[in-house]
Amino acid sequence: MSDLENLLNTGLMSNENGISPETRDLLIDSNFSQVVNYQEDTFIVTQGSEPDALYFTLSGVFHAISHANAQAPQRLLGRIEAGQFVGDITLFDPESTASASVKAMKNASTLKITPDSFKAFCETHPAQALELVSALARGLAARLRAANEKVL
């Protein structure tokens, strides 16, 4: 099974937990996204930089890491595995900077959606865009609940 086929059955891309097959197929269309492969130890997002895309993990594992300053040790915030996403904030707040770095822990691949592609998707497929945004919001809410549990 290919990385893309794996993604179709996991996380936000699965019909059970996220978006419909119709929306998924429209999103995967090459006009709206691209598959990008990464070598181990490659950063796809760097803390403090302007994020450039939403990334759905197809294969491999990424770590979200942060540090308070250049001298502080890195702190592991979480693992991002197949079916999970990062970079979502850039779609909703394009002026933001990345609050953490995201690093491939082994060879990995993602489905990358740029803000311009996301905007085009929203303009040409508004009903499916609403479905995608709702699924992203559920994913963000789940992250927030998990973060609250760690703090409390």
Predicted regions and their residues:
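Cytosolic regulatory regions built on CNB/CRP/Popeye-like sensor folds
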Residues: 1-152
